[in-house]
């Protein structure tokens, strides 16, 4: 009897972020990682939401264009932009800039836009969504902020607070429809998109998808 099983398309995470990779691994589904080569500079006059959505879609499309897959691929692109006092907050890159970020946000609310795109190369369809998270920071002594930074070295994280680690101690409250959005990959939105693309999330084993 011929094999009539319809196999799902290859799933690719378009990201170099170890945090996003760790989140996607929670779902227990097979995927590959390809880092997009993309200029992530915001456009003049672009809102934080527009920047995040544009970059998430651009990452997914850029990676899809490099993949030779006759059966198609599903590519996950994600981008996060933080905004505070009307300005976009980037990744600090250094200890000094991270400390300055945290000091400026003491007792204040920061808005995080976690944009997600699922691009289906079979149809050319791109599902996109922006999940907004409001975060209120505690007021802490600068010495504690410095100690946190030396412990976590979150210099590749927008806003300098890694909520999945010790950074949670910097926060008073998190308000979001998706608890994984703040870490960088909104899994509630992603699983909704995968279902819409007919991806079999509940296959019993990895072998069922091979």
UniProtKB/Swiss-Prot annotation:
Listed Gene3D superfamilies: 3.90.950.10
InterPro entries: ITPase-like_fam, Maf-like
Localization, UniProt: Cytoplasm
Keywords, sorted A to Z: Cytoplasm, Hydrolase, Nucleotide metabolism
Cofactor needs: a divalent metal cation
Active site: residue positions: 79
Molecular function terms from GO: nucleoside triphosphate diphosphatase activity
Catalytic reactions on record: N(7)-methyl-GTP + H2O = N(7)-methyl-GMP + diphosphate + H(+)
Tree of life domain: Bacteria
E.C. code: 3.6.1.-
Annotated site location: Important for substrate specificity: 19, 80, 164
One BP term from GO: nucleotide metabolic process
Gene Ontology CC terms, in alphabetical order: cytoplasm
Protein task: Nucleoside triphosphate pyrophosphatase that hydrolyzes 7-methyl-GTP (m(7)GTP). May have a dual role in cell division arrest and in preventing the incorporation of modified nucleotides into cellular nucleic acids.
Family: Belongs to the Maf family. YceF subfamily.
Name of the protein in question: 7-methyl-GTP pyrophosphatase
């Amino acid at each position: 009897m011929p094999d009539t099983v319809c196999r799902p398309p290859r799933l690719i995470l378009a990201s170099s972020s170890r945090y996003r990779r760790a989140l996607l691994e929670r779902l227990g589904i097979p995927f590959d990682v390809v880092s997009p080569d993309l200029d992530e500079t915001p456009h003049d006059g672009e809102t934080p939401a527009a920047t995040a959505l544009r970059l998430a879609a651009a990452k997914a499309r850029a990676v899809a264009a490099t993949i030779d897959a006759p059966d198609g691929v599903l590519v996950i692109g994600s981008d996060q932009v933080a905004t505070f006092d009307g300005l976009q907050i980037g990744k600090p890159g250094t200890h000094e800039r991270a400390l300055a970020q945290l000091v400026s946000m003491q007792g204040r609310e920061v808005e995080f836009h976690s944009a997600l795109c699922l691009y289906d190369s079979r149809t050319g369809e791109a599902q996109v969504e922006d999940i907004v998270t409001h975060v209120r920071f505690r007021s802490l002594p600068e010495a504690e902020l410095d100690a946190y930074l030396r412990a976590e070295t979150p210099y590749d994280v927008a806003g300098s607070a890694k909520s999945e680690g010790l950074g949670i101690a910097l926060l008073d409250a998190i308000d979001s429809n998706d608890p994984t959005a703040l870490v960088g990959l909104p899994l509630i939105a992603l699983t909704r998109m995968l279902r819409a693309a007919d991806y079999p999330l509940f296959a019993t084993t990895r072998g069922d998808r091979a």
